[in-house]
Amino acid sequence: IEIQDPADFTFRAEKHCFGINLSEAQRYLGVGFENTLDAFSYQGLTKEELTNKYYFKPEIYFENNYVKQEIMLSGKPKHSFGIIKLSFKEKTKIELNDEFCIGIIIKGKGEIKTISQQTHILPGNGLFFPAVLDELEVIPEGKLEMIICGIKDFPYIKIK
């Protein structure tokens, strides 16, 4: 799964995307081809150097017999993009702290139950949780893993 921070820049090498011819401004965000090359580092790194410099190591924030909550990307500094991973073993209620976020099911299947509906979930399902949704219940069939992305200070969900 690739999750892109809204502040990230994307330079496109291809001249066509979904049958549409892209202008140079669309491909290089208006900075031009030559300046785009300056955005990249051409210094070679070993696998260990690359891992130490750029890989985020998950940190266990909370764990009990029902669920494990890991910080994948903390969302620091304040109000920046954050990612957590939730691994469910049993039925668990979570509180969303009045903030919208998205969820992606990465492993397992089950149900998500809110005050007004119940939805079956499978790997690859993307979910939008609006800020007005105070609480939801995750009911896994076996083990279920979900990535949650949000922009509020971590932790932006609470395990109940």
Describe the role of every protein-language-model region.
Residues I1-F18, L22-E24, G142-I159:
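A short hydrophobic beta-strand segment most commonly corresponding to one strand
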Residues S87-S116, P123:
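Glycine- and acidic-residue-biased ligand/ion/polar-headgroup-sensing regions
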Residues T92, K109, Q118, E135, ...:
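Residues that cap or initiate secondary-structure elements
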